[in-house]
Amino acid sequence: FANMPYAALPRTPRPLRNEDYLGDVLVQKARQRRNFKFVYKRKIALPQQAGPSADPMYNRLIYLQAEDDLISTGNLLVTSEEHVAELAALSIAVAMPDEGFPRSVDALVNIDVPEFIPPNWRHTKSAEEWAQLILGGASRVGANAPDADLDDLQLKLIHVASQHPYYGAHWFYCHRVNDQPEIVAAMPRDLVIGFNADGMHILDAGEGRAALATFGYADIYRWGGSSSQFSLIIWDAEVESTFELILTTAQAADMAAIILDYINAIMAATGVN
C-alpha cells in the first residue's frame, strides 16, 4: 500500500451507506482490528431542508458540523478578516456558556485564541492582534452580550456556513492522472474534489484552495472506478462536448456512492422518478 500513488493522500471520512448501522460497522471494524473513529456529518444537505429544527439537539449537531467546516478544518474558506473575527467570537461564546465571553485581550489570549481561527488565517496575525479583532467582532454579532442566547449564537454561525457554495460538501483528495483535453491539462496535479447539493466542485489542493470548476450532476454522464482510480465523463458546456477526468484516489468507492446518493436525494426532493 505504501508504494501506491495515493498512499500519501489524506483520507477523509467515508460516508456510510443508507443501509449501514453504526452497531454493525463497529462490530466489523473491531473484528478487523482496525483503528477507526466516527465523525458526525450530515450526509445529504439540500437547500430545501436547511432550516433550523425544533429539536435543539439536532441544531447542536448541525452547529458542530458547521463549526468544524469553518474553523477546525477550514473546508469552507472565509474570505474576509472581519468575518473571521465574527465567527471566532461566536465559536468562543458557544464554547464558554458558563464562563461568559472574555472581556479583554489578555483573557482571550489565555484561552488560546488562535484555535478559534480558521487554518488559512491562523498564522497571519499574533494572538494579541486576533484577540483585539475578536472583541470587535463579538460586539457586531452580539456574542459578548450579557443576555446572549446560546441557541441564537449557534444559528448565526450555521447561517454563515449554509450560505457558502460548498456547504455540506464531502471532500476527497486526489491526484490528476490524464493530461488531455485542455480543461484537464490546465488543472494542477493535486486536487480536492467536493460533492454537495450543487454538484461536483474541483479545487486546487494547494494553500488557498483555489476553485477550478463546478459541474452539476446533470453534467456528470458516467462515473466509476477501482481500488486506486476514479474516472468521470463530464459535459463541458463551453465546448459542447464531453471529456474524461481520471483521478488516483483510495476513495473511489466513496466518491461513486456519494454521487449516487445525492442524485437520488435530489430526484426524491423534486418529485422526479
Kindly label every feature range from the protein language model:
Residues 1, 39-40, 108, 232:
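Short beta-strand element of the conserved SAM-dependent methyltransferase core
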Residues 1-34:
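Eukaryotic mixed-charge, acidic/polar low-complexity intrinsically disordered regions
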Residues 4, 19, 38, 164-165, ...:
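Intrinsically disordered, low-complexity segments enriched in small/polar residues
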Residues 67-69, 74, 82-83, 87-273:
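N-terminal recruitment modules of adaptor/scaffold proteins
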Residues 13-16, 44, 124:
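Small/flexible residues
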Residues 30-51, 55-70, 79-90:
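Long, low-complexity, serine/proline/glycine-rich intrinsically disordered regulatory regions
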